Structures are given as structure tokens and as C-alpha cells.
């Protein structure tokens, strides 16, 4: 290596970090950023600044650069692309050597890629659109504690989506009344019930009281139906120690599945909890509370496809992914993209779905996609079509809002699901023929008939805020 000499001062980032001739290595971690630069900052300099500030650079040259191989460790901005329909911003593709990141630590990856660089003054707005994790890094992460196949074997249910329900009202019920609602929903035909994300341990219902009543309800429903049932017990807590205390108690009373809010709870806590679940044979349901703070602004933040990849690496057997048809944000093409990233072993680049890189997961198991938020029986044909079998369809208000009560709401959803799955297996176009399929099933199910009458006019037809850039062409 040639002798280097130190020259103090400030130089343009592009002199060191803009490398359009660079060909990424298979072991590089690749990132795509959407950059909106400040006025007067050209694209190459802005891209190089992001590469520098998210890897080895600082605002001035430092003599300690001579003590390491900066040419190896630096991030490299190697490509720039236009954003379709928006000339205020551009895509910058940056390659990072794998040795910049601690093995198995999504915390460390995010600290670099979405750390101080997001407050950099030369950048008006910055969004992390996608990451390609090299297989060499994927193999250092434990991933889902169980995965899709193991969970199906545990609950002994195959060939259809699973049915769930979030207990409502989400806050205010006593432990006994909460357990009663769980029992009625599970007895009526659901596979799972669920704590809402903001149920932890409040004055109206402490966590241990809830766990006890819920497990009693679950066991009673199992005995009466002959099916394996479960309730997602939310162990999210103020401290990691308290979180693990609640998880241990859930295991002690025989609960098959626990739940964590992975963004508000933290990626470090989630990775640790996933490892605990793997060691203790527990299923882990993941809620994405706070995601929209990060991913809904189309110019600044972190796209949900990145948060999906991070969760798969950190660990979780279920992840909320939106519904397309319900009350929450998420267009169809994007949602199908991150569902594949959650479940498939290999996902190729597909700009029509917002996927910027090939992603190889190797042998890492996938996780169930969870559809939840403003859905009811009329949505069932679309949900079965969009999400397929390896999903959990969760109807909260669409179960507990039934005029005849919780058990009737659960029965209506179970009949609707089985009718749609049967029609699909017969080769019918379920989404197109949905009304006919549900109407025929309702002739033999008064619970479904009443549900269809109750929610026939309920739609959530709002435009998506975060559109795929490809749709702007």
C-alpha cells in the first residue's frame, strides 16, 4: 500500500465517497435512499454525503484516517436514479462493506443507516427505501423463533389462513370481562384472540390478572371445540427485565404464544425476546405500533419494506402488514411486496412492487403476514386472494361488533373464510365472485347473514398517501 500523508482541511464528500465505477460485492450491504437535497447541493455531493455520514466520514479530514484502511471501510455511493414523477428528489444507491456492522445486530445496522445522517443539514429530506442484506449477514441473524411450518404443526391447522380477533374495547375492561370476550370469540370459531398493542399492565387490568383469565378462557374453548387455540399475551413492558418476567409467566401457565410491540419496545428487546421464544418453544406475535411515524411520509423516514426485513432478521412469527382493503394505509402492490419479503426464501428485484434489490433469505424461515384493521366479512374474498394461506386474518370490530354477540361474530367469520377457501380450491375467482360465494354460504349461517347485512355499506375508500413511485410515471 502506498504511503499516505495527512492533509488537514475540508473537502467535498464526492472526492472520497462518490464512486460510479464501483461494482458492489456479494458481501456488501446495499441501501437505496430517496434524497431531497437542499438548494445548491448537487446530486453527487448529496449522495456522497449520505454515504460518508452513514459510514466512516465526518465533516473534516482527520489524521486517524491514516491508521486504518479507509478505502475498504467507507460506504460508496455508486448509482443515482431519477424518482418517477418527482424532480425534487432522487434515488441514491450506496454499498457498505459487511464488516461495518456487528453480526446479528439490526440495532447496529439502523444506528448507522438511519442515525445522525437523517439530521444532516445539507439534506432537506431523506428516506431509506430498501436494503439488500447479503446472505453472509442474514446467516448471522436468528430470524423468526419458529416460522410458518413449525407454527402450523404446533396448532395443527393447515390449508387455510388463520383467524384472529383483537379484543375490544382495547382499553378499560376488567380481567374477568376480558377473559369472557376471549372465550366467546375462541368458542365461536376463531383460532386466536389478541391483546391490543397498548394493553400492557394498567390500573384497570394488571398483566397477571389478564394472563390468568385469558388462559382459563383459552383452555375452556379448546376443551369445548377440540381445536388448539391461543391468545397473544402482550409482554411489552417498561423494562427488558419486566418483559422477560411476563414472558416466563406466560410459559408457566401454558400459553402457546406471546406478543411484542417491536418498534416501541425496541429492536434490542425484540431480538432478545425472539431468542427467548426460540429457546422456550413459544410463538411470537409482532405488532408494528409506531410504524406510520417512520414510514408514511413518502420523502422522509424508513419504508415499511425495510421495517419488514428488519423484523424478519430480529425475529417474530407474525407481523402486522396492513390489509389493502381495511382502514389502514397500504396499497396493493406495495403490500404484496413486503408480504413476500416476510414469507419467501428468495425475492427478486421488482420495481413494480417497490422492491429495489434481490433478497436471499437462505434457509431462514418466514413469518405469517397479519391482516388487521377495519376488516369485516365482506372483505374476506379479497383478503383470501391477497394474503393466501400463510396469513392471519384478524377481525376485531368485525367480530365483537356483531349484533348477536362475540361468538356469533366469530362464527360468521369462520363460515365466510371456509366458504372462500373452498371456492378457491374449486378453481373459482374468489375476489371477483365474492358476493355470490358469501351469499350462498349465508343461506346456511344466520350469523354470517346478519354480519353481511350489518356491514354491507362500510368501506374505507381513501387515497394512499405513500404511493409507489412507479405509479407516478
Swiss-Prot record:
InterPro entries reported for this sequence: RuBisCO (IPR033966), RuBisCo_large_chain_AS (IPR020878), RuBisCO_lsu_C (IPR000685), RuBisCO_lsu_C_sf (IPR036376), RuBisCO_lsu_fd_N (IPR017443), RuBisCO_lsu_N_sf (IPR036422), RuBisCO_lsuI (IPR020888)
The protein's required cofactors: Mg(2+)
Residues at the active site: 168 (proton acceptor), 287 (proton acceptor)
Cofactor annotation comment: Binds 1 Mg(2+) ion per subunit.
GO BP annotations listed: reductive pentose-phosphate cycle
One function term, GO molecular function aspect: magnesium ion binding
Keyword vocabulary terms for this entry: Calvin cycle, Carbon dioxide fixation, Lyase, Magnesium, Metal-binding, Monooxygenase, Oxidoreductase
Keyword Thylakoid on entry: no
Domain of life: Bacteria
Positions carrying N6-carboxylysine: 194
Residues holding Mg(2+): 194, 196-197
Binding residue positions for substrate: 116, 166, 170, 288, 320, 372
Additional record remark: The basic functional RuBisCO is composed of a large chain homodimer in a 'head-to-tail' conformation. In form I RuBisCO this homodimer is arranged in a barrel-like tetramer with the small subunits forming a tetrameric 'cap' on each end of the 'barrel'.
Function in brief: RuBisCO catalyzes two reactions: the carboxylation of D-ribulose 1,5-bisphosphate, the primary event in carbon dioxide fixation, as well as the oxidative fragmentation of the pentose substrate. Both reactions occur simultaneously and in competition at the same active site.
Family: Belongs to the RuBisCO large chain family. Type I subfamily.
Protein name: Ribulose bisphosphate carboxylase large chain
Organism: Thiomonas intermedia (strain K12)
Amino acid at each position: 500500500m502506498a504511503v499516505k500523508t495527512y492533509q488537514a482541511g475540508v473537502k467535498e464528500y464526492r472526492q472520497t465517497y462518490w464512486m460510479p465505477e464501483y461494482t458492489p460485492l456479494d458481501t456488501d450491504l446495499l441501501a437505496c435512499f430517496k434524497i431531497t437535497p437542499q438548494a445548491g447541493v448537487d446530486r453527487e455531493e448529496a449522495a456522497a454525503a449520505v454515504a460518508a455520514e452513514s459510514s466512516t466520514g465526518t465533516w473534516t479530514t482527520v489524521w486517524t484516517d491514516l491508521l486504518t484502511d479507509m478505502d475498504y471501510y467507507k460506504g460508496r455511493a455508486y448509482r443515482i436514479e431519477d424518482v418517477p414523477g418527482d424532480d425534487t428528489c432522487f434515488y441514491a444507491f450506496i454499498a457498505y462493506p459487511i464488516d461495518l456492522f456487528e453480526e446479528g445486530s439490526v440495532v447496529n445496522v439502523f444506528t448507522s443507516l438511519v442515525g445522525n445522517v437523517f439530521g444532516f443539514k445539507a439534506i432537506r429530506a431523506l428516506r431509506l427505501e430498501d436494503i439488500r442484506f447479503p446472505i453472509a449477514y442474514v446467516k448471522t441473524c436468528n430470524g423468526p423463533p419458529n416460522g410458518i411450518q413449525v407454527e402450523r404443526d404446533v396448532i395443527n391447522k393447515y390449508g387455510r389462513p388463520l383467524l384472529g380477533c383483537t379484543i375490544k374495547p382495547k382499553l378499560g375492561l376488567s380481567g374477568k370481562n376480558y377473559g369472557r370476550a376471549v372465550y366467546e370469540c375462541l368458542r365461536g370459531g376463531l383460532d386466536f384472540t389478541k391483546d391490543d398493542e397498548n394493553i400492557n399492565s394498567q390500573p384497570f387490568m394488571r398483566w397477571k390478572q389478564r394472563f390468568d383469565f385469558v388462559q382459563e378462557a383459552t383452555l375452556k374453548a379448546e376443551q369445548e371445540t377440540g381445536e388448539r387455540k391461543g391468545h397473544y399475551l402482550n409482554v411489552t413492558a417498561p423494562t427488558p427485565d419486566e418483559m422477560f418476567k411476563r414472558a416466563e409467566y406466560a410459559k408457566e401457565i401454558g400459553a402457546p404464544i406471546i406478543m411484542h410491540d417491536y418498534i416501541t419496545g425496541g429492536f434490542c428487546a425484540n431480538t432478545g425476546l425472539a431468542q427467548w421464544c426460540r429457546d422456550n418453544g413459544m410463538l411470537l406475535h409482532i405488532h408494528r405500533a409506531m410504524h406510520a411515524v417512520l414510514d408514511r411520509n413518502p420523502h422522509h423516514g424508513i419504508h415499511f419494506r425495510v421495517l419488514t426485513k428488519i423484523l424478519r432478521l430480529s425475529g417474530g412469527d407474525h407481523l402486522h402488514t396492513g390489509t389493502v382493503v381495511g382502514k389502514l394505509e397500504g396499497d396493493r402492490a406495495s403490500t404484496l411486496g413486503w408480504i413476500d419479503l416476510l414469507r419467501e426464501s428468495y425475492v427478486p428485484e421488482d420495481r413494480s412492487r417497490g422492491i429495489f434489490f434481490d433478497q436471499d433469505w437462505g434457509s431462514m424461515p418466514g413469518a405469517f403476514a397479519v391482516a388487521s384493521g377495519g376488516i369485516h366479512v365482506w372483505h374476506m374474498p379479497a383478503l383470501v386472494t391477497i394474503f393466501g394461506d400463510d396469513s392471519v386474518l384478524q377481525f376485531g370490530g368485525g367480530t365483537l361488533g356483531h349484533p348477536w354477540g362475540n361468538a356469533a361474530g366469530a362464527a360468521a367469520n369462520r363460515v365466510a373464510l371456509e366458504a372462500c377457501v373452498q371456492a378457491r380450491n374449486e378453481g373459482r375467482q374468489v375476489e371477483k365472485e365474492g358476493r355470490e360465494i358469501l351469499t350462498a354460504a349465508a343461506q346456511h349461517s344466520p350469523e354470517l347473514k346478519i354480519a353481511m347485512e350489518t356491514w354491507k355499506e362500510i368501506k374505507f375508500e381513501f387515497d394512499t398517501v405513500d404511493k409507489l413511485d412507479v405509479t407516478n410515471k
